[in-house]
């Protein structure tokens, strides 16, 4: 279980996240919703320790994540994989090498420096790419891919980390509706097939309702809603977005979305087990 207790992050006199508290069961798909500037990205970055909390604690299975340093902190970042809005791929490198970067925390330093990837890691990376129909692009430069393809590569990279948690920060913000569905289905797949907890920042309430088990709503850095998607009423939407409910609930501009979970190849379970 992931437990957040009174988590606060201040930049000067401004609290980007203010006294956030919640607990998340293993295997959940959590949507963090709210308008721009609500503190969603800062919250996810604190969970991974890319941003340092000013106050509060993060506990995972009894471990105080906020106290980790050095090697233990690097291990935590491997266990809590980040997926960014802008993909964070190395454009000049091929797709397979970008995915293999997710294995760096599992390798000795000399292998990392030489990029001497073990054959089992290469097989793991190819298996991850195959989950998202990206294996045919393994030898292609990452900067030659479309935005949706790059995001699928980023998800494959996160998967080969063999994480306990995937933290996805606005993964569909720059994607068209078709690629939005492909990427959200990919996140749902790693959640349902591999039992990995997914915490995903989303602007789209429609998508949040369809894909997520639970929603955490933020406004001005504070958690103002925590519940099932069915509990997200028009009144709550107005509080979260400071807009008329009709504007919020109808602003996604996506056709109705139905999640798709294609069957996995039998060998794909290697991604989960190593």
UniProtKB/Swiss-Prot annotation:
Localization: Cell inner membrane
Disulfides per UniProt: none
Catalyzed reactions: phosphonate(out) + ATP + H2O = phosphonate(in) + ADP + phosphate + H(+)
GO CC entries: plasma membrane
Listed CDD domains: ABC_PhnC_transporter (cd03256)
Topological type in the membrane: Peripheral membrane protein
Record protein name field: Phosphonates import ATP-binding protein PhnC 2
Source organism phylogeny: Bacteria, Pseudomonadati, Pseudomonadota, Alphaproteobacteria, Hyphomicrobiales
